[in-house]
């Protein structure tokens, strides 16, 4: 239903062309949170980009900096947030999942602050794990499980092995969620982390308030789908 509705909305859009307007001076530049950006776009959280390209998360951040747009570092990034900040001078935001363990969650917020981020993007529509049918069909899991199907895929893609897999193991070892605290960090070859730890079904606006109370910078919520929740977000001190 959601897919059908999304397609219907896009099909209903029309471009209204106006003429005889002076467009000799035009710019896509705008400003958000007191900083100029080249266009009203930002790189969304892109976890596991390192599976596609060696140092993929760093490459994304550098590309965003060159283009003059924000880049959002993901909680599930394969590269530590501190390494991304050090490697890429740009407008970096951080995406946060509200873990079940509130002490771990708040300690993680402090780590994000210490790393130098000034904009926090809190994901609120992940109370349960996603039903990704294409992942089930392909056998892809997070963390990776070296099944016969996966091993066959790796062996038939020697280019990826040379460009991505080999550098990863030589520099960092097995793929892992680099930002996870030791208490429930797991290598991508270990048993998958329980969604009950990372996707709390008890999250509420009080959790947002606790983070807002300690976060000094800009704070956004990701995943709002109704105007009523937008109003609540504003009432709870969100910037967007």
Regions found by a protein language model. Give the residues of each.
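Alpha-helix-loop-beta-strand connector modules within alpha/beta enzyme cores
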Residues: 66, 82-93, 146-149, 154, ...
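N-terminal capping/small domains of soluble enzymes
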Residues: 1-127
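Glycine/aspartate-rich loop-and-adjacent alpha/beta segment that forms the canonical ThDP
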Residues: 128-148
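Glycine-rich phosphate-binding active-site loops on the catalytic face of alpha/beta enzymes
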Residues: 124-130, 237-240
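An N-cap/entry alpha-helix motif that binds or orients negatively charged groups
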Residues: 1-34, 143-203
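Glycine-rich beta-to-alpha transition loops that act as phosphate-gripper elements at the mouths
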Residues: 75-77, 99, 202, 221-227
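Glycine-rich phosphate/ribose-binding loops and adjacent secondary-structure elements
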Residues: 207-240
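Short, hinge-like loop/turn segments at secondary-structure boundaries
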Residues: 89-92, 111-112, 138-141, 237-240
